[in-house]
Amino acid sequence: MSQSGAVSCCPGATNGSLGRSDGVAKMSPKDLFEQRKKYSNSNVIMHETSQYHVQHLATFIMDKSEAITSVDDAIRKLVQLSSKEKIWTQEMLLQVNDQSLRLLDIESQEELEDFPLPTVQRSQTVLNQLRYPSVLLLVCQDSEQSKPDVHFFHCDEVEAELVHEDIESALADCRLGKKMRPQTLKGHQEKIRQRQSILPPPQGPAPIPFQHRGGDSPEAKNRVGPQVPLSEPGFRRRESQEEPRAVLAQKIEKETQILNCALDDIEWFVARLQKAAEAFKQLNQRKKGKKKGKKAPAEGVLTLRARPPSEGEFIDCFQKIKLAINLLAKLQKHIQNPSAAELVHFLFGPLDLIVNTCSGPDIARSVSCPLLSRDAVDFLRGHLVPKEMSLWESLGESWMRPRSEWPREPQVPLYVPKFHSGWEPPVDVLQEAPWEVEGLASAPIEEVSPVSRQSIRNSQKHSPTSEPTPPGDALPPVSSPHTHRGYQPTPAMAKYVKILYDFTARNANELSVLKDEVLEVLEDGRQWWKLRSRSGQAGYVPCNILGEARPEDAGAPFEQAGQKYWGPASPTHKLPPSFPGNKDELMQHMDEVNDELIRKISNIRAQPQRHFRVERSQPVSQPLTYESGPDEVRAWLEAKAFSPRIVENLGILTGPQLFSLNKEELKKVCGEEGVRVYSQLTMQKAFLEKQQSGSELEELMNKFHSMNQRRGEDS
């Protein structure tokens, strides 16, 4: 795996609103209020006490055994860790008063550390030397410490220079008996007030949305791609017997990116466990030499870092492991050197470690969503070694029973993961996945049985027209009215549901719906519900994307048959877009996705490349590094087939400037295409970090197995 899995929980991974296409990219008034409120609550100056929001990056002991004998050595080590993305940030508050520097827990306001000013030997800024551009350095040593500590903080809301000036003025007053700080605070107070009044900065006009080439364009035809099975499980249907090659390539790309992100988050979680264990070890070492009743140096910060993940975080990781297993089984024909069968063994290493960390399989057993597909279960049965098989069996039915054999009630909800990178997986790909649709009947046709005809007659009381019935399009559902999700309406009251995720119709019987729409229920079968939109269109929607809604949520009552309906109609049929580029661009993009997958999920050093089974010419990759200038950035953007508007907007930046932009900023500058820019930059960062270092996960697992061996020898 690449080092990107060890990326820290830092700002920039949060999701922002998309850039508006009709003018200026703006924050909503509520978002603006919340941002200003957070800023004003975290960064305040009152009387002789100032407070700043900071992120603790690292604490090093200045010790020859650690190869740190000076501040410069400590900075070099921090830069090295940053380049490998091995820094873990911890949000906290830094308070400065005329007696001490205090670190507070950002949530509980509990004091973590108290550094009396006489123990602060040095304050310094470290600017633009690592991925955190504004860093404050403190060297502290109390009378009981034989060696000083070097603390690093990222000043993400107020510049490090400003915090440094505040601390220096407090130190000068303490050492020299002067009164410089009141004047310093007065100037800083004005700067913070000005900053608060202008958040967020004004945005320029939003770019023109990226235009995809249509399916009939010459570039969209005759693409070479892998063969696809003529029939697949679930309600996936095609108008022709073979899916267009470019569409298949896009689907593989999306599934691969989901797999990348899932594996990144699994590695991130394992590395977090390692960091917590290291902090716990350091904490115990420091406690040994402290006096009774007195805190050891840096004890508060280490205690915070040593906290284990919550149960919810363990559940999230188990869900992503199940998702990764499903995707490995689905993509196994497209993965080689190493194969999916080889890679699953490296997935079970972290799984074993995580199960042991949370004291057994009980938490993992409780995780039913997502279920495994039939292919995933067969894949595991055919490839696990006895020890892995024993671990798998210990996790219970929710891990061993495929979706197709799972009881239909209660309904297992659609699983949409949230990734630490901020990348949002395409819901349509997840909706069609075998682990979501196996065992679900297809959308029903209208006239198939007397029961269905009776349902149609009942529904015609609500609908002005009946649906056309294409022959042989799907199988009938098992009718079970009023049994799903606890809806028990009275005969006189209409029933409504709220859409949880977008859904695109694939034939005339299904209905395309958008997230947060409220629709009227005409039929509520087990798996497919017939709904009617405000525009009067009726059709079937899978029940696992529906949530309960009240009639008042609709905003106004639905009109009776024969009257006009209001509101925009959802599209009834939408074909997937073609890949926006020519053949060479498609092949190059698939090469990059393929190469990135092997870097993310293989912790075998010096493995040969794995390839999709796609005929292609060898592309020339345009490099992008932290040393790239504007010309190289522009060439990289053009090589990635971004629109001219994006190339023009971002082509004036250097490599470090482009890499420093987070997802929210890219969305504001690039509109919807900013998500793709962010995704490509994330992949490029991972590639660069992989070149510099080996696998964090391999190192961790080696340590873990060594510990087990030593324990076995000791026993």
From Swiss-Prot:
GO terms for molecular function: actin binding; cadherin binding. Keywords: Cell projection, Cytoplasm, Deafness, Non-syndromic deafness, Phosphoprotein, SH3 domain. Residues 213-222, 234-243 have a biased composition (Basic and acidic residues). SMART domains: PTB, SH3. Residues 492-551 form the SH3 domain. The modification Phosphothreonine is found at residues 303, 469. Detected in fibroblasts and placenta. Residues 46-202 form the PID domain. GO terms for cellular component: centrosome; cytosol; extracellular exosome; plasma membrane; protein-containing complex; ruffle membrane; stereocilium bundle; stereocilium tip. It comes from the Eukaryota. Residues 183-243, 448-487 are annotated as: Disordered. It is found in: Cytoplasm; Cell projection, Stereocilium. Belongs to the EPS8 family. Stimulates guanine exchange activity of SOS1. May play a role in membrane ruffling and remodeling of the actin cytoskeleton. In the cochlea, is required for stereocilia maintenance in adult hair cells. Interacts with ABI1. Part of a complex that contains SOS1, ABI1 and EPS8L2. Associates with F-actin. This is Epidermal growth factor receptor kinase substrate 8-like protein 2.
